[in-house]
Amino acid sequence: MNDKLQTTNYKLKIAWLYPELMSTYGDRGNIIVLQKIAEDNGIEAEIVRINQTSNSELLTSCNLIFMGGAQDLQQEIVNKDLLENKGSILKKMIDEETPGLYICGAFQFLGNYYKDAYGTKIKGLGVFDMYTESYKNKPRLIGNCVISPTKPYREAASTAYTLNAKPFLVGFENHGGRTFLSDKSQAFATVEKGYGNNGEDKTEGIHYKNSIGTYLHGPILPSNPELAVYLLQLAYEKK
């Protein structure tokens, strides 16, 4: 895969969920890259900013979804809005294979639950079959990360960068929560360097239908533009 999309000219709507609250570690750079690559390929890309006051139906008009990470307070605000308002629509779109990229806290929201270091359990949307827990006696997982994506992404990914003859992606992780997948075969990638979902089982992220959840900041798409191409191609094919 290169930076060229196999498309004809068309319009694309990219949903940016909670841009004021969920954009830590430069995650807005992912939106910039998606829009730039789309426009370089003759695609008119409209960024649709979705926040707490947005009509939930606005989300359904979009072809691609992005949500970044946040600090704990901002995550509480967003999680409340998702559970009470937009979550059912988001879940339906993901289940119906609308492509999406969900970073760190956004990735955690889509699991079954998040348990903080004090034992408080926060309900998730239950889109991804996984859970996340934080522990008082365990450190945050911080540092550069190198991952080898698993199928189905690997077959479509660029082979321009290799590590031990495997395609790989790079990014930066910084998370206190440790995520455990019910089915490890759904992992987005295998960790080559760093911690990944939990620092134990070498899984990183999740690949569910056309959605990718990951702990990789960087931001991830400027560091790995072939992933942006992959998501945009999925959006075109789904449209």
Cite the ranges covered by each PLM segment.
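N-terminal beta1-alpha1 cap of cysteine-dependent amidohydrolase-like domains
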Residues: M1-K92, E155-L163, P222-K239
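Conserved beta-strand scaffold positions in the cores of enzyme catalytic domains, especially
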Residues: W16, I47-R49, V127, G171-E173, ...
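Glycine-rich beta-alpha junction loops
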Residues: Y18-E20, G176-R178, G218-I220
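Short coil/turn connectors at secondary-structure junctions
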Residues: C62, E97-T98, I122-K123, L169, ...
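Structural motif
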Residues: L64-G68, L101, Y215
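Cysteine-nucleophile active-site neighborhood
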Residues: D72-P149
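Pocket-forming structural segment of enzyme catalytic cores
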Residues: Y118-E204
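A glycine-centered loop/beta-turn motif at secondary-structure junctions
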Residues: N198-Y236
